[in-house]
Amino acid sequence: MKTGEDARGEGSTGPQKLGLCVLCGLPAAGKSTFARALSHRLQQERGWAVCVVAYDDVMPDAFLREASARPLPSQWKLLRQELLKYLEYFLMAVINGCQMSAPPDRTEAMWEDFITCLKDQNLISSAACEAQSCYLLTKTAVSGPLFLILDDNFYYQSMRYEVYQLARKYSLGFCQVFLDCSLETCLQRNGQRPQALPAETIHLMGRKIEKPNPEKNAWEHNSLTIQSPACSPEASLKLTDLLLTALENPVKCVEDNVEQKETDRITCSTNILHQADQTLRRIVSQTMKEAKDKETEGPSAHHQENQHTVGTTTLVS
């Protein structure tokens, strides 16, 4: 792994280093406080540009109450995917060194909150055209390494995997930080909030949450669990190492090919088993039909044979 000096990108003529960090954990685990502190430290100590996207600040207020461990309503899920699309538009502008345009299909209130989020962190400036639909990137956004920290519960693995797919699409660094906080502490903190979630929601999420599992999911190998509320000096060093590793080892397209091949292999195997099952079912069905037909035809054929025998005997007599 390269040193922190290399990761700053100073004097480098290569492409800008970009990373996505998924910050996940139960509600009131301390994620937002942690994200702000991490952003400040990375800017001060590393000179990196940091963009903290707190989902609670960008998602429409009407849907914040839906952030529970129940199955995601379709509209809520679509809004999460829409926010990822906003992030992709920002990343495309950074990667291509151009203005950031607004997506044609957007939720206006959420888009405005996203723009405010970027402006407040000095990453974009005012609209660059009369239509107010494109924005200029600031020098901060393009002059060195840039880390996007996504602050949300991300309690389902599938939610985090969508972010990983975005990192893979553009060969970005990717890592996950899980804030491990006791259920009791989360409930206590939540109770002190002006807009507290129902306690049963946090209890349910505590049972449903899918923590990062690097042993099971190869794409989650760059993950770190930190005990909240305290972050020890040792954990702080591990966190820095995690972020540096992510920047210096972006997700490669070859990983996409390997995963796709594995997916294709599983699909192929599933199809073969399905075809074999269908063939077996047809054979069994045909065999049963033939057996049933024989049972139905048997007595009638035997009766006709007897009649023929009797008639022949009478004729001979």
Short names for language-model regions:
Residues 28-29:
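ATP-binding Walker
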Residues 23:
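Hydrophobic anchor at the beta1->P-loop junction of P-loop NTPases
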Residues 16, 32-139, 143-146, 159, ...:
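Conserved substrate/cofactor phosphate-moiety recognition/catalytic segment
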Residues 148-152:
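Structural recognition of the conserved hydrophobic beta-strand(s) that form the central parallel beta-sheet
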Residues 1-20, 44-48:
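Extreme N-terminal, non-catalytic leader segments
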Residues 181-317:
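Conserved GTP-binding G-domain of TRAFAC-class P-loop NTPases and closely related GTPase folds
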